[in-house]
From Swiss-Prot:
This is Sesquiterpene synthase 15b. The Asp-Asp-Xaa-Xaa-Asp/Glu (DDXXD/E) motif is important for the catalytic activity, presumably through binding to Mg(2+). The lineage of its organism: Eukaryota, Viridiplantae, Streptophyta, Embryophyta, Tracheophyta. Mg(2+) 2 binds at residues 292, 296. Mg(2+) 1 binds at residues 292, 296. It comes from Solanum habrochaites (Wild tomato).
Amino acid sequence: MRRSDNHHPTVWGDHFLAYANLSGANEWEEKEHEDQKGEVRKMLVLSPSKSLQKLELINTIQLLGVSYHFEHEIEESLSEIYNGYEEWIGKSHDLHVVALSFRLLRQQGYYVSSDVFRKFTDDQGNYNKALVNDTHGLLSLYEAAQFRVHDEEILDEAINFTTTHLNLLLPKLSNSLSMQVSYALKYPINKTMARAATRKYISFYQEEKSSCDQLLINFAKLDFNILQKMYKREMCDITRWWKELDLVNELGFARDRVVELYFWSLGVYFEPQYKVARNILTKVLCFVSITDDIYDTYGTLHELTLLTNAIERRNIDAIENLTSYMKLFYTALLHFYDEVEKELEKENKSFRVNFAISEMKKLVRAYFQEAKWYHGNTVPKMEEEYMKNGIQSSASPTLATASWLGMGDEATKEAFEWISTEPPILVASSNIARLLNDIVSHEREIERGDVASSIECYMKEYGATKEEAYMEIRKIIENNWKDLNRGCLKPTTVPRVLLMPVLNLTRVAEFVYKDEDAYTFSKNNLKDVIFMVLDDPIEE
């Protein structure tokens, strides 16, 4: 018997095809952009090396989404702060300074000890009551604590303390600061999509003109709008490809979400140099989404057996046993990977595609296992069955590997071999994505008869209530964030530039699965965010 989820149609249609002839930045914009960039660089270089001014400038540049222009200068500044950290920050009793420097360094991959916060606690390890009205200090501590690793109870306590007191302060704050704190409580810097956050922070800083140099705001707005034009052209090309592929019309059960998936890839890397990587990743996301719908919704167990075997073979001859709708999908999938291979061959990087296909095979095996659980009405064991399979069914290994396909020379064969072994950072990312998805999909899946989700597995295995299962699974997610944070600290096995897509894929999952499955039900809230990022220029 076939299932159906009756997904709503695309909310975007052919909208982005209208940008086929959109030009990039005009001559004035390019000149203005270069001039302003030079001025911001001067501000960064000339600000005193170990000062709150330098810390806040770096933070603002990052939040406004323009730090990719100044990576060298920011790295130099933070390296200098790291080398003199004990001497400067060790002696400081300003919570905002200590927490901000701690976060900026951890964010950059530097390990600094959380013991630096002990000076703000009493003998029992509780934070001093004198801090409860220090809004900027609390907000900085809250953001810093999101970068915690295991055995940092002082940061675990910091999250409880700051969350409680920032919520209590909200009614007393100015409108702009209140909006900023509310946004941070829902979307902390370490757990949100950079482009969506940038759009918000530009508006926050515009409201609070005194706290940020007007030149910097103007530069951020101009940069945002120039990039947005580029995204519109990219989205136009991808929409055309999607229409020519025509799979969702042929497969009426599949979610038509190409714009949402481009937005997903933008969460992984938004910078101009990743144009090719974004294009490939978006297309892989499209195939993963359709594969999910075939295995999760439409395919019979017999059909899924045949498709799994065909994908394992990766040979057009395997098509003969497939049903007509699967033939279309399978042919398109093989053609796509062949095309990517041809493109990468020009740069002697075609070896990458074999790694990507290998991950795709693991993904369909995991989807097939879930289908067998469904058809057998089986509730698997939480740890050794469900979570083990969930590493792959989260699609994170497939997407992380695919995210490297169009990247630069740092994505070596050794790096691909490393990620194919499921290193801890990838397992953590996968666990987070799997469990976040499970939480927001649970009620809907129960209605349609799915029993194999982490919530159901946990309830059955531990005799827990639904609420207890949710609480425990949120704890597991937080513990995996600690593993992920640890995996991003130097020294790393592969260059950090390769770890960023893994981290950013996790951030996208946190963003998309915050209150609901915003990908599946994109007409609810996600469409407004996508409109702001992809379609709505900021008034200059």
